[in-house]
Amino acid sequence: MKSDSDLRYETLLPFLSEERTQRFDAVLKGRTRHLSVVLENIYQSRNASAVMRSCDGMGIQDVHLIEDINPWVYNRGVSKGTPSWLTLHRYKQQPDPTGACIQNLRDRGYRIAVTSPHVDGFNVDDVPIEEPLALVMGTEWKGVSDRMLQQAD
């Protein structure tokens, strides 16, 4: 099944110059699914949108949004259209959005790393990246949930 981004790209192709098509292809080949970003209940939608822009700029294709407490609202001024080019996995309608995200990542072979200034762990330069890795960022105020922290590898 093709993603929304794939369908958008295929729709645009007939209208693009050869040079532009080559540029798109080069950018898409630079994308990775080896590293994914998870945003857990980010309070300020503009912060989530800014992270998405960073993911787009670094070639990270998949962004997972856990929205059981704080829903993400599209912020055009900050995101600059990047959600159209990323694959967004939204967890908000399930009975357990955090659990659904964790299960999806585990089923796809991801290890889970959380960002936290409050726990001992790896320095960012020492994080093992041999296997697919999901990097989890929590709310601006409290950070990642206890549950997500317990699930971290």
Feature map (PLM): residue ranges:
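Post-transcriptional modification and biogenesis factors for structured RNAs
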Residues: M1-D153
